[in-house]
Amino acid sequence: MASQDVQTAARTIIVASLNPVKIAATVQGFSEMFPGSAFTSRGVSVPSGVPDQPLGDAETLQGALNRAQRAREIEPDADFWVGLEGGVLEEAGVAGSPKLVQSFAWIVVIGRSRTGKARTAAYYLPEETAKLVRDGMELGPAEDIVWGKSNTKQTNGSVGLLTGDVINRKGYYVQAVVLALIPFKNPVLTFS
């Protein structure tokens, strides 16, 4: 069943990022969820309204939502606006040990009549990276230092480095984009 937001004519997706990995993951997620549909996409640079390295679920989700909303404000004639925001979550470790740090991302898809949201899986960062993040560094630059690489957030990302590219950053985001599109795939159902 085709949804009210995804039709047969080419639909325009605005991704609230200029990061080629985020744009490619978004397009792939839409294409997988709606295989008979045509999409055009472009990225725009918009502020997230949250710190450069969001901490916790609420702040990260707010960053993704802010990005999607701001993309809609500057490109109002599109059909979909997508915000992707990576975040970290600190949790208490064993007494006397440093806090553990998880990495994850939120994806928000705004359409003309509904909004979808999904969170990626989470994974723990190694202490070498976690210490830099706890000290205020963004995850991407922290991983670049730990791994001796540059600009990994626009290639395989932290998840790709840690899994040996079994899961790269694009693949990591694609699944969450698909999950954020559930309300659009099921237009007769109600999602809050």
Identify the function of each model-found stretch.
Residues 2-78:
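N-terminal polybasic phosphate/anion-binding patch
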Residues 52-192:
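Anionic-ligand binding patches
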